[in-house]
């Protein structure tokens, strides 16, 4: 409570007045930050923010998945969530930053690179977005969330939070002279004031942080050597006393494994030598530590020697690289996969492709039951062939004896006997004659195979009023667009989609092509895609000109409707 309230009290200071005790010759840099006590306030502010965020994520965000802390970008850089929360809230919140495109500025102010804007946005959504909205509702006095009940938070911390939020609200009303009209306005106002002081404090600490990092890196080498000695000692202890706890993987090894997973071909990571050369390498190598750690984790026996005996059974060819003296980690087979390819006596079964093939079941229990042939054809066999539709039976073919047969080998007999050969009436006459002849030859199969709804025969199921309505919707050239089908369904509710599509392809499109072949036989473009492309190039704003003709698909299981 004290840290939060002191920051809020500092906002009420009138900075237009110059203190009398301030020396004009003293520069702002010469003022000791410790004298103002603001560094202590920032630390207390962060100490209240972090446990609240940890408890909130564990309480409300555990269902969405595990959120590791600290948060890291895709490049492996750690993100200061407190600084990110201050910067986003200072610029108006997540929605305002996204609408204004200010994520690059937020990323730079948060100490990240410009290409980390996408990662920072994702981290804010996962970690801080719900937390910020929850704080805004608490400040506004929402009865559902005003009582802070988070697991893992002490009563003293809850009291500090409640006191801080109430004081922020009081300071905002005192400064503005009215209550906040927008949800979260008090918290945004307070954070805007706090961010300016936090930035000054953060810049002042930056130089000291760089020195601390160098000092830490210098001591890190000695710490690593000590860790290697401890690892070597633990190897002896584990083999001599199997009852002790298993080996733990060092952080450096885990970092090396993470780098290998990101880019296995990175030359800076080094290469893994041949298995025969492993003995000459010490345990300080990351890959050697990783192998020892894996062996300790996969060892189920009490004796350490049994694990190495099992490892010795692995064939050396698994670790040999045909291209050179080293091999890639990704090309290595695991011991468990190789063990499955071994028989009981240790002989190889075959390649991995042969292992994946299903085994053929051989024996009397796995044979198909085939009845013995008696030489007599049972009458029940015909039921497996279904019902014969065509060719017709002898009784049905008696009516077809009077059908005029075409002469074989004579070819097409031209010209026809019509008054106007090649006219529309001539073509319709010959099509009708051929259809009637086919109807006599097929018999009932003519209707079962839906020949009666092919071509202009579809018109027999349409009334004159329905034809007049659907022709009024047709464009030139005709197009089977979704808008056309929707309008046709509106004015013809009794017609299904299948009937409308059938009419388009069997009547409208054929009549249009027939007119084209007679009127402009040398200038026919039947490709509807070309029409769409030309309309797009001319940038015709009319939606009808840019309609792309999509195929209308019908389900084969749908019943035929006339």
Curated annotation (Swiss-Prot):
Family matches, as SUPFAM superfamilies: ARID-like
Gene designation: ARID1
A biological process term (GO) from this entry: positive regulation of gene expression
Protein name: AT-rich interactive domain-containing protein 1
Domain (ARID) ranges: 43-136
Keyword DNA-binding on entry: yes
Residues covered by the ELM2 domain: 358-448
Any one GO molecular function term: DNA binding
UniProt cross-references to PROSITE patterns, sorted A to Z: ARID, ELM2
Disulfide linkage: none
UniProt keyword annotations, A-Z: DNA-binding, Nucleus, Repressor, Transcription, Transcription regulation
InterPro entries with a match to the protein in the record: ARID_dom, ARID_dom_sf, ELM2_dom
GO cellular component terms attached to this protein's record: generative cell nucleus; histone deacetylase complex; microsporocyte nucleus
Coarse class of the protein's main subcellular location: nucleus
């Amino acid at each position: 409570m004290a840290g939060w309230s002191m920051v809020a009290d500092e906002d009420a200071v009138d900075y237009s007045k110059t203190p009398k005790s301030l020396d004009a010759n003293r520069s702002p840099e010469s003022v000791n930050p410790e004298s103002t006590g603001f560094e202590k306030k920032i630390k207390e502010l962060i100490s209240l923010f972090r446990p609240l965020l940890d408890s909130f994520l564990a309480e409300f965000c555990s269902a969405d998945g595990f959120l590791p802390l600290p948060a890291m970008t895709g490049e492996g850089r750690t993100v200061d969530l407190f600084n990110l929360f201050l910067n986003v809230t200072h610029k108006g919140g997540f929605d305002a930053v996204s609408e204004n495109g200010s994520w690059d500025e937020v990323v730079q102010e948060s100490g990240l690179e410009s290409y980390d804007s996408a990662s920072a946005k994702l981290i804010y959504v996962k970690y801080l977005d719900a937390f910020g909205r929850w704080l805004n509702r608490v400040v506004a006095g929402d009865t559902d969330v005003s009582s802070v009940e988070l697991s893992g938070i002490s009563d003293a911390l809850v009291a500090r939070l409640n006191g801080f939020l109430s004081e922020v609200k009081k300071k905002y009303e005192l400064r503005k002279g009215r209550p906040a009209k927008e949800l979260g306005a008090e918290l945004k106002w307070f954070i805007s004031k706090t961010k300016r002081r936090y930035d000054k404090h953060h810049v002042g600490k930056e130089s000291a942080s760089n020195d601390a990092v160098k000092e830490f890196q210098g001591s890190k080498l000695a710490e690593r050597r000590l860790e290697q000695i401890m690892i070597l000692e633990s190897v002896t202890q584990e083999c001599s006393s199997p009852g002790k706890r298993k080996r733990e993987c060092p952080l450096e090894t885990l970092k090396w494994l993470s780098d290998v997973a990101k880019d296995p071909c990175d030359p800076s990571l080094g290469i893994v030598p041949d298995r025969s050369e492993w003995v000459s390498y010490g345990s300080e190598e990351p890959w050697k530590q990783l192998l020892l750690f894996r062996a300790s984790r996969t060892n189920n026996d009490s004796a350490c020697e049994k694990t190495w005996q099992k490892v010795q059974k692995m064939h050396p060819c698994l670790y040999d690289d045909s291209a050179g003296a080293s091999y890639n980690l990704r090309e290595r087979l695991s011991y468990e996969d190789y063990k499955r390819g071994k028989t009981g006596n240790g002989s190889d079964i075959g390649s991995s492709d042969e292992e994946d093939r299903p085994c053929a079941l051989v024996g009397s229990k796995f044979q198909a039951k085939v009845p013995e042939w008696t030489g007599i054809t049972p009458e029940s066999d015909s039921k497996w062939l279904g019902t014969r539709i065509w060719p017709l039976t002898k009784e049905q073919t008696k009516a077809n004896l009077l059908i005029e047969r075409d002469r074989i080998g004579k070819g097409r007999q031209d010209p026809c006997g019509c008054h106007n050969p090649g006219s529309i009436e001539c073509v319709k006459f010959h099509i009708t004659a051929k259809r009637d002849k086919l109807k006599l030859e097929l018999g009932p199969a003519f209707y079962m195979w839906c020949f009666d709804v092919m071509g202009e025969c579809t018109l027999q199921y349409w009334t004159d009023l329905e034809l007049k309505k659907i022709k009024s919707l047709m464009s030139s050239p005709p197009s089977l667009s979704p808008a056309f089908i929707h309008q046709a369904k509106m004015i013809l509710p009794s017609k299904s989609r299948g009937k409308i599509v059938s009419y388009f392809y069997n009547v409208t499109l054929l009549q249009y092509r027939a007119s084209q072949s007679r009127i402009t036989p040398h200038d026919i473009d039947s490709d509807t895609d070309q029409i769409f492309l030309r309309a797009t190039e001319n940038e015709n704003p009319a939606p009808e000109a840019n309609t792309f003709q999509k195929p209308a698909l019908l389900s084969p299981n749908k019943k035929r409707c006339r």
